[in-house]
């Protein structure tokens, strides 16, 4: 995992200790985010299991268009599969479902309730991840209590077109210089781009189509993990 930023004279007391405890929670480098619409040849559960066989240790269930009961049913299935492979499960947005299925964490968007509100509801039961797209968002999200962030899109990708021009590697580097929590780069990352992203300071990468769009999901996962070492 990327090196932690050293504490400065301007840091509030205890910041370094809190950062270290958060990094211990976030003990993965490859973060798989689901999109069942990318998976044509099998069920989403089967596709995720292939990725877990390949070595993924963290999965975010992100199926925003599902009815609540369908999502809950799918979350229970994902919890069963991820436990089998000793992997972490995060639920997108829905703190209630994350708690109901005993997920490891929740992942928030910029239009979700803030991390501080999640902490009031869930205490320390959930690891809190959050999506960010700029330096200001990253700083505010850390201040609100997130344990880690995704940042991007780093490169152009169909799933992130609404965010406009990708901020790119230089902005990723600036974000890493300003926050102390782990940062996962997201957006258009292919295996030959991983080194550039990690050299910019990313603690890991988050992938959707990069894994789920592959013909051999388990092998594609292994390819990413090999270059992440």
Go through each PLM region and give its residues.
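Conserved N-terminal beta1-alpha1 strand-loop-helix module at the mouth
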Residues: 2, 21-113, 119-147, 164, ...
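Glycine-rich adenosine-cofactor-binding loop
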Residues: 168, 185-190
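Short, electropositive alpha-helical surface patch
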Residues: 201-210
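Active-site helix-to-loop segments that bind/position phosphate- or nucleotide-bearing substrates
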Residues: 197
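Short, structured segments at the rim of ligand-binding sites
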Residues: 6
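A short acidic, helix-capping loop that chelates divalent metal ions and anchors anionic groups
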Residues: 98, 155-161
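Short Gly/Ser/Thr- and charged-rich N-terminal loops/segments
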Residues: 10-17
